[in-house]
Amino acid sequence: MKMTKTFLLSMLLACTGCTEEINTKEVYVKGDSGKFPDYGEVLAFPGAEGFGRYATGGRGGEIYRVTNLNDDGEGSFRDAVSKSDRIIVFDVAGIINLKSTLIFSKNLTIAGQTAPGDGIVLYGNRVSFTDADNLICRHLRIRMGIKGSDGKDAAGVADGENMIFDHLSVTWGRDENFSINSTTARNITIQNSIIGQGLQNHSCGGLMQTDLENGITLFRNLYIDNKTRNPKVKGLNQFVNNVVYNWGSGAAYNMSGDSEGSSLTSIENNYFIKGPVVNWQNVRQEDGSIKVELVDMSPTKPFIGGNERFNTYCVGNFYDEDKNGVLNGVEILPAINWEELCSGNPTFLATCPEIFPTISQQSDAEKAYEWIVKYVGASLPVRDQVDAYLISELTSLGEKGTIIQNEQDTQQFPLGGVGEIESGVSLLDTDGDGMPDEFEDGYGLDKNNPDDASQ
C-alpha cells in the first residue's frame, strides 16, 4: 500500500464536518502549576473544543490506507492503529468484526469520514485508547455487543493525554460504554458523540473520573438508554450542551463527590429528558428458572450524589419529565428548585472557574438538543441504522426508548444488530496521497503528484 508523509492532509481532512466556528482561545491555565503542555497553537480540526482541542494526532506522519475489513493483516484497521505517527484513511466501508481487544497507538489521526458508503463499524469486542497520547479519532462506530467480553467497557482510557474523540457512536458495552477512569489521564475531549444502550445487567454510560489536575470535556454528546452513569463524574470535568435521555434506576448525572477526593466541575446548558424507563432484565421465576423479561423501572432524578467536596458551576440545565412528546422542560435552578427536582448536596459556585476552556460553539440547552438531533454520532459519510433508531427514540420525547440486554434479540432491539452498512465506492485518488482527485482539482493541486500532500 502507498504511504506518504504529510502535514497538509491532516488539516484538509479535518475540514469535513458540521462546524460553526473555530476556537482560537489561548492555552488555558491550570491552577498554580502554570500552563498545560502546549501541543501546538493549531486546533486538532476546525470545531475542536475543550481540554483536548490541541491534540496533534498523526500530524506530519504517514498516510495509511485501510483497504479491507479483515480483523488483522496488511491493509486492516488493526494494522493501521498498531504503529504511531499515522493518518489513517479508508478505501472501504462496512463491518470490522473484532476477534480481540483493539489497541490504539500514539500520535494517530483516524479519519472515519473518509470511508465510502455508510462508513465503518467496529463490532464484537472492545477498543482501548489507553496510552494513545495525541490522538484524533473521528466518525467511527464502536459497537461491542453481547458476544464481547463480559464485564468490559466498549471503549476506555485508563491512562494517556491529549486526545479528542469527535462524532463517535459507542454502544452495547458490557460494563461501561465509554469510560475515562484514571488519576493521570488528562487533556481529553469527547464531543458530538453518542454513548448509548449499555447492555444489562450492567447498563452504564461511563465513568468520567480523574483528579483535580487533569481535565476532561464532554461537549454536545447524547447519552441514551443507559440505566446509570450518564456519566459518573469525579475530578476536573466540563459537561456542556449534552442531552441525557431515558436513563434508569441508577443515575443520569452522578456527582460522585462522596467518593474519596474532590471535584471541580462545570455543568452548563444540558437537557435531561425522561423516557419510558423500561428494561430487559433477568427475572427469576417461581420454579427457580431465569427468564429475560421487559420490566418497568423507577428513574432517579437527573442529578444525584455529591457533597461539599463536589464543587460545581451549574447553570442553564433543563429537565423534561412529563413524557408527552413535547420538549418543554423546566430549568434546574440550584437556589430555587434543586431539592424538588434533584438530590445530593454539592457546593454550588457563583462563577465558572477560569480553568475551564471557553467552548466557542456553546448554546442554550434547547439549541443543543436541536443540533444533536441533526448531527450527533458518526454522521459522516451518513448516519447508520442504529443511530437513526436511537435518534427516533430521542425525538419521541418520552414515548419510545428501551434499556436492552442483547442487541441481537429482535424482540429487544428490532435491528437485531448493527443493521445494513453499504460498502459504496471510494473516490478516485490517482497519486495515492490520501486526497481524492476532485479535491485536488478543486484546490489547484496536482492529482498526479503525491508530493503536493506535504506542501
Q: PLM features: residue spans?
A:
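Bacterial Sec-dependent N-terminal signal peptides
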Residues: C15-K35
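Acidic Gly/Asp/Thr-rich repetitive segments characteristic of extracellular carbohydrate-active
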Residues: L43-I88
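Extracellular beta-strand-rich solenoid/capping regions of secreted or surface-exposed proteins
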Residues: R78-S84, I95-A111, I120-R138, M144-E161, ...
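Right-handed parallel beta-helix
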Residues: N107, G112, D133-M144, D159-R174, ...
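Extracellular beta-strand/beta-solenoid scaffold signature
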Residues: Y123-S128, G148-G156, W172-S182, L199-T210, ...
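Extracellular beta-rich repeat passengers
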Residues: V233-P414
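Acidic carboxylate motifs that coordinate Ca2+ or other divalent cations, activating on Asp/Glu
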Residues: N324, D429-D433, D437
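Proline-centered structural pivot motif
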Residues: E422-L428, E438-Q455
